[in-house]
Amino acid sequence: MSTTTEVIAHHWAFAVFFVVAIGLCCLMLMGAFFLGGRARARAKHTPFESGIDSVGTARMRLSAKFYLVAMFFVIFDVEALYLYAWSVSIRESGWVGFIEAAIFILVLLAGLVYLVRIGALDWTPVRSRRQSKPGTIKNATNSHPQ
């Protein structure tokens, strides 16, 4: 086969794949539109609480610390994947791979030290750290107003 027919065959297969994928997405969207319910009432936007009258809203404000911890977890988890792949191929990579992995680990440790120094991993606010003394323990059950 010549190169032009190979290129056309390759692009033809991709075009067929692309058209089928778009068609399948459109088919599922149309099916959901035609078969789905049409509830337009005000109660649609309230949370379902098993027959109990709802109290308050379903939206809760979360601290940004939760999102920071999630991002740190993803970052360090991906880095652990890289280190696992390196450990599997340590014989093939030799000393060059070992030095590269050592530099990678040092960069990770520098990032972790930086996060600790700026207080990104500290869950207590600065004002509560100043107020609490090292020898006292605050009772958490009596701290809420009644």
UniProtKB/Swiss-Prot annotation:
Subcellular location: Cell inner membrane
Membrane spanning residue stretches: 14-34, 66-86, 96-116
Domain of life (superkingdom): Bacteria
Record's bilayer topology term: Multi-pass membrane protein
Disulfide bonds: none
EC number from the UniProt entry: 7.1.1.-
MF (Gene Ontology): NADH dehydrogenase (ubiquinone) activity; NADH:ubiquinone reductase (non-electrogenic) activity; quinone binding
Gene3D superfamilies from the UniProt entry: NADH:ubiquinone/plastoquinone oxidoreductase, chain 3
Record key words, sorted: Cell inner membrane, Cell membrane, Membrane, NAD, Quinone, Translocase, Transmembrane, Transmembrane helix, Transport, Ubiquinone
Catalytic activity entry: a quinone + NADH + 5 H(+)(in) = a quinol + NAD(+) + 4 H(+)(out)
Keyword Phosphoprotein listed: no
Pfam entry (one): Oxidored_q4
Gene Ontology cellular component terms for the protein in this record: NADH dehydrogenase complex; plasma membrane
Enzyme class: translocase
InterPro entries: NAD(P)H_OxRDtase_bac/plastid, NADH_UbQ/plastoQ_OxRdtase_su3, NDAH_ubi_oxred_su3_sf
Protein purpose: NDH-1 shuttles electrons from NADH, via FMN and iron-sulfur (Fe-S) centers, to quinones in the respiratory chain. The immediate electron acceptor for the enzyme in this species is believed to be ubiquinone. Couples the redox reaction to proton translocation (for every two electrons transferred, four hydrogen ions are translocated across the cytoplasmic membrane), and thus conserves the redox energy in a proton gradient.
PANTHER family on file: NADH-QUINONE OXIDOREDUCTASE SUBUNIT A, NADH-UBIQUINONE OXIDOREDUCTASE CHAIN 3
Subunit note: NDH-1 is composed of 13 different subunits. Subunits NuoA, H, J, K, L, M, N constitute the membrane sector of the complex.
Family membership noted in the UniProt record: Belongs to the complex I subunit 3 family.
Name the UniProt record assigns to this protein: NADH-quinone oxidoreductase subunit A
Organism expressing this protein natively: Serratia proteamaculans (strain 568)
Gene: nuoA
